[in-house]
Every structure is written in C-alpha cells, then in structure tokens.
Amino acid sequence: MSRPQRISVLGATGSIGLSTLDVVQRHPDRYEAFALTGFSRLAELEALCLRHRPVYAVVPEQAAAIALQGSLAAAGIRTRVLFGEQALCEVASAPEVDMVMAAIVGAAGLPSTLAAVEAGKRVLLANKEALVMSGALFMQAVKRSGAVLLPIDSEHNAIFQSLPRNYADGLERVGVRRILLTASGGPFRETPLEQLASVTPEQACAHPNWSMGRKISVDSASMMNKGLELIEACWLFDAQPSQVEVVIHPQSVIHSMVDYVDGSVIAQLGNPDMRTPISYAMAWPERIDSGVSPLDMFAVGRLDFQRPDEQRFPCLRLASQAAETGGSAPAMLNAANEVAVAAFLERHIRFSDIAVIIEDVLNREAVTAVESLDQVLAADRRARSVAGQWLTRHAG
C-alpha cells in the first residue's frame, strides 16, 4: 500500500483549513498533514498540531514561533515551528509535499500559493484573491510547472464538475454557451435599500446558508465575493466575462451550472458544506466520503432564481468592469475591497461606503500591465494607499 499523501494547509485555523483537516482525519490512510500555518489564532494552531502532529507549523513572527515550539516540545510533539512569509513559501513548495490547500485569505496568500504552483504541486485553490490579482501570470505558472490546479470555491468546483474533461480546448469548441455562477444573495438580498447604510458588521456576517470567516461573509453580503468569483472563473476556465452570468439562488443548493449549446444545463447540487468541494479536490479524479449528509430533495422543496440588482450590489458591477478592463484593475479592486472591509468590520465606515471606496480607487489609479509578481504587488500597494487616503478624509 502506498504512503498517505502529504498536505500543507495554508490557513489551517480558518473555516476552510478546519474543514480540510476534518477530511484528513476521516481518511488517515490516504492523507497526513505535513505543514499547518496560522496567523492570529495561535491557540487553535497549537491544538491542531497536537492532534495532527505535522512536520512543520508556520506562524507570522519569531516570538510566536518560540512560544509555540516550547509548548509543543513540552507535550512531546516534534513539530518544527517556523515563522514569516519565506517559511510559508517553503512549506508550500517542499519536495515532500504532494498537495497544498491554499486557504490564506486575501492578498497575503498570493506568494505562498504561487510558490506551490511553481513547484508543480496539486494546488487546492481556496484563495480566490491570488488568481484575481495575478491572472495570466498565475495561469502561465500553472502551465509552465505542470501543477494541478483544482478550485475549492463551491461555485468553481461545481463548474469544474459540470464541464467536460477537455474544456481546456476552449469553451465554444466543447459546446459551452455560458457559465451560470450562482450566488445566495447574502443576508441583505431583501433588505430595503435605504437601510443598507446602517447595517452592522454582525448583520453582514450572519450568512443565511454558509459558515464562513468574517471577511468573506462581508464580501458575500456586498456580492463582491461573487464579483471576485466571476474574475476567477474567467481565468480558471478561459472564459470571457460575457460568458459568465451571475444568478441569485437563495437556497444555495445548486452550486453553479453550465449551459450547453444543445439546450442542456448541467448543474452540481449538494448541501452547503465546504467539505464537499474540498474532498472532491483532494481525491480527484476519485470520490471519497466527506462527512457531508446526503441532500434531501424533499426537504429542499423548491429552487428559486433571481437576477442580481446592481443598485443593491454595486460591488458586483465594479468587479465586472475590472474583469473587462484587465491589467492591474482586478488587483486594485481586490486591494481596495480588503481595506474597505477591514474598516467596516472595525466600524470606521458604513457598509455602503465599501463600494464608494473601491470606485474611488479605480477612478483615481491608472490601470497598468501586470507581467511580474512585483508589478502585481505594486498595484496592490498603490490601491491600498489610495483607499487609506479616502479613510483619512472620510472615516469616523
């Protein structure tokens, strides 16, 4: 019998990381943790190291590494604790690693995700921002290295499952008319427009269907999450923005669909649980038990669909425009959104200001070509600076 596959989980203490480790624990004969990384929840990271006994753990700073190393050593755990961004890249690209779960939220996850790609790993991509920011640069690295890139977002995973194996030959060539990207509409789908300016971070984070981290919950509430996913879908499946249509589906049972020229629409359905796409990507092309309960169609009862309202969700419009513009526009969109969401979560701005900040950044900053990681990160820094200037002028 072959040895278990070794996985580095980047962002192990987040919701995606924890779901990944749940699947690992269900299949100890197939998978083992090689490296676990965490940013701020270091007590949780310690508990995960005690349970999974990885070869490495990675934390942001040296002081935290020394403290965690001491705690683990006292418990008889031989995990070696590293720190810093270079260590993240090292555990993502180590020769011993078979697959990498890229689940660090936001731009911070780009260097380590790209390191895994350049090392030719099986990359389970949960960090959509990495692909949104670097686009062609990222996909060229995938082709050059021979990495296997498998999407973890439930929507892109559903699209991947609904497309023919030869979709890389071109969507039109394999008979695809369009991709239907589903969205729940979030917690404010029916909130009166005049009330959106006064909603709280707690309300924005109360997603009706999914259990997610705070940043992605706010992105779902604004539908920026869907805008980022539209950009991601274009890169993953070599689609034009006009070939991707966003459909609001409040039940989150259909995770996305593919519309074919013969009139067929193929969809992937399931309970809203991230262990389904995670286990699919880990085992692909096989399927394994994920721990997710079977879908009860009788309990679902009905499936509803709506067009998104751009007045209610201006972030979706801004993301679509950035997708059409290309170049550094998606990286700047993402950076401005990260700054704005952080300010909203800290109660410095209103929910409705998120789109205002993003639009201000996109209007002020010139779009440039991005042909290197340095250029991507430079665009990210410029956008964050302009967003910060807006906060200085307007935030309470």
UniProtKB/Swiss-Prot annotation:
It catalyses: 2-C-methyl-D-erythritol 4-phosphate + NADP(+) = 1-deoxy-D-xylulose 5-phosphate + NADPH + H(+). One of its GO terms (molecular function) is 1-deoxy-D-xylulose-5-phosphate reductoisomerase activity. It is an enzyme of class 1 (oxidoreductase). InterPro entries: DXP_reductoisomerase, DXP_reductoisomerase_C, DXP_reductoisomerase_N, DXPR_C, DXPR_C_sf, NAD(P)-bd_dom_sf. Pfam families: DXP_redisom_C (PF08436), DXP_reductoisom (PF02670), DXPR_C (PF13288). Inhibited by fosmidomycin and 3-(N-acetyl-N-hydroxyamino)-propylphosphonic acid (FR-900098). The keyword Cell membrane does not apply. 1-deoxy-D-xylulose 5-phosphate binds at residues 128, 154-155, 184, 207, 220, 225-226, 229. Its cofactor is Mg(2+); Mn(2+). Pathway: Isoprenoid biosynthesis; isopentenyl diphosphate biosynthesis via DXP pathway; isopentenyl diphosphate from 1-deoxy-D-xylulose 5-phosphate: step 1/6. Gene3D superfamilies: 1.10.1740.10, NAD(P)-binding Rossmann-like Domain. GO terms for biological process: isopentenyl diphosphate biosynthetic process, methylerythritol 4-phosphate pathway involved in terpenoid biosynthetic process. NADPH binds at residues 13-16, 127, 129, 213. Catalyzes the NADPH-dependent rearrangement and reduction of 1-deoxy-D-xylulose-5-phosphate (DXP) to 2-C-methyl-D-erythritol 4-phosphate (MEP). This is 1-deoxy-D-xylulose 5-phosphate reductoisomerase. It comes from Pseudomonas aeruginosa (strain ATCC 15692 / DSM 22644 / CIP 104116 / JCM 14847 / LMG 12228 / 1C / PRS 101 / PAO1). The lineage of its organism: Bacteria, Pseudomonadati, Pseudomonadota, Gammaproteobacteria, Pseudomonadales. The gene is dxr.
